[in-house]
Amino acid sequence: MVIHSATKYLGGHSDILAGTVCGSHELISSIKKSGLNFGSNISEYVAWLLERSIKTLSVRVLKQNDNALKVALFLSGHKLINKVYYPGLEKHEKHNIAKDQMNGGFGGMVSFKLNDNINSDDFVKSLKVIQPTMSLAGVESTITSPIQTSHKKMDPTERDKIGITKNLLRLSVGIEDADDLIKDLSNSLEING
């Protein structure tokens, strides 16, 4: 069985909430009652928005992949960045696997750690093009702090053990001009460095 969010890249415009469940008839039958009890259909409007978005999926994803690689390369060469997590970088520990499996596109998500002397909240507030948000994978570039969002309720000691620290940021790269994104990041690093 495969459960996939249609809210992120498939939707791509931060304007729907949807998902898909795919699998054999046997597996789907085992959860069908839950779907009927809890509601498993999206509205006609959301279906229309999703259909609209899927038509541009390949164009959006290609641009996001291209931009993300450019941004990751910039960040990986900056003195105020401790680490960049992006499988498109040759120095990423899983680069060869990603290269084999991902057909040259490494995704639009770039995580990175700021130097310890930079306050991540101030860094995010200084950004002008990239916006802080809870939503990821839209056409616009957004940034989140996992300790304030996805991992907020996790024990801080456990978070630190797995590398989710106060200086870790998660950047969802959109389809803006890559130079504008790099300039935005560079300006914020300069202001806060």
Language-model segments: which ranges?
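Structural motif
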Residues: 1, 7, 20, 48, ...
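Conserved PLP-enzyme active-site core in the AAT-like
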Residues: 1-80, 85
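Positively charged, small/polar-rich N-terminal and surface patches that mediate targeting and assembly
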Residues: 22, 83, 131, 137-139, ...
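PLP-dependent enzyme catalytic core of the Aspartate aminotransferase-like
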Residues: 118, 125, 141-193
